[in-house]
């Protein structure tokens, strides 16, 4: 049987048996009333108070837990024993009620704790007493039937009804069994009724009198049916109220037990009494809940009055708030009028800016070309990236040196291990010498001297080991220092990169400002992207115009200084005027005979002959960026000896065509130091 412990089929069979036993127990309780005996499984609790539904849900088959499943199987077996004992105890109580002919079961106190044998013996004794009583009743019934058949009328004029009544009183049927449905007649009453209807030797003037009793009723009483239906309806209402208020319902559990055991059959008197008791418990619980709800209702009424007062205060505050909002609306109207005036003023300023834009359209093409300066900046950043690669190669070289030092450290470790093995060998020799001490007493002194020498060698080896450890620590310190230098170099490179990227972002932002906001009303073929906010666009346009104005003022200052220098040179006689025909002839000869000019000039982040953006000039004029070499003046093309200078001819031609370019070229020739400082601002010479 051990292999069946925990079997799902066995456990399901036990669960069904427990369900059937519980239904039978409820049926007996409905007829004899609940009996209160201690439980065999749980001695501290009454057997009739056990919640079998909860126990069956808890002790169930669990696939993943065999230990708990076996325990549940054992508990189910014990519960079967417990329910069987309770069934025997309740049946014994029911038999006692039948023996004593008690229709309503009396209230019983809690019974003693009885063993299985005592319970079975008590049940058997009750069953024997009932059997003896039933035999006595059967014998008495047979004797009464014999007397009825052999009896004759004593008087001729005696009515038949009186003899029938006397016979009926003589053969009185046994008392009805309490708890059985009243609609079911006794089987033993049928022959009695036959004997009453067919008396021997009846007179001609006799007549039958029919009487309806509880024992002979074939259908339930209409009043009982109506009362029980009303009781069920009231019970449903009470249970629904308890469920709606989240209250435990004793009547609901009792109704479920009655429905499982009896279905929709008429209830006995004992069950109706228990039904009324459980219903009164639920009604008392609902009465307490109604009292609490009334208290809460009174409290809610008080809160309602307080809320009304708060509503009045809030209405007054709302009126004040509305008045304040009206005042704010008036102030907002005044502000709107002021903003309208400011808008008109801004429109007037916009018209002024349009006139200024007309004067700055000539410089727009040069500003477009200045975007190429960013490309030169990118080339410089690429060169710096190459420098970073060179630094990374140096770091790799340092790492190789660190690996070399690590190899040396491994060699030193191997030497230390060799020394330790030698030391172990010497120790083994010493041990062998000690073992052979008795046989080599003559050589003891020599061995002692050799042992001293070995000790000295051991001390020397220990010293060498300490030196190797010190060298290893020194190598580790060098390795840490090299790693620190590497990390420092990496940090410096990252800082340099971040600084260059930040400068690149600034240059791009300046370029974007000067390219995206030169004018709010550009032609249709060159529309700029607007941010959607006219005020922000106008502020950016004003910023760009301020930058242009500052650049133009600086350019005017340089032009004035160049004019003064030109006038001084002209007064000294250094300038000569050449006719235009000779200039063209000289230029053509110079172009045919001159070698191609060399364009190998080192410049700052803008190509020679290209102008920076007005916003980017402060970054290049008068100072250089970190890591940026100073720009050198552009190299002049070589000339053959004996030829006229094509540069002079070109210079005079450009003077005739563009005075600004001529002044810039003359400034570069007269003041080379200023040309080296800011070559990015020199205008580019165009071939004619």
From Swiss-Prot:
Top-level taxon: Eukaryota
Coiled-coil ranges per UniProt: 288-572
Record keywords: Coiled coil
UniProt-annotated stretches for the region Disordered: 143-162, 168-189, 322-341, 366-385, 592-688
Comp. bias regions, Low complexity: 671-680
Composition bias, Polar residues: 143-153, 369-382
UniProt entry tagged with the keyword Thylakoid: no
Protein name per UniProt: Coiled-coil domain-containing protein 157
Species assigned in the record: Bos taurus (Bovine)
Lineage: Eukaryota, Metazoa, Chordata, Craniata, Vertebrata
Gene for this chain: CCDC157
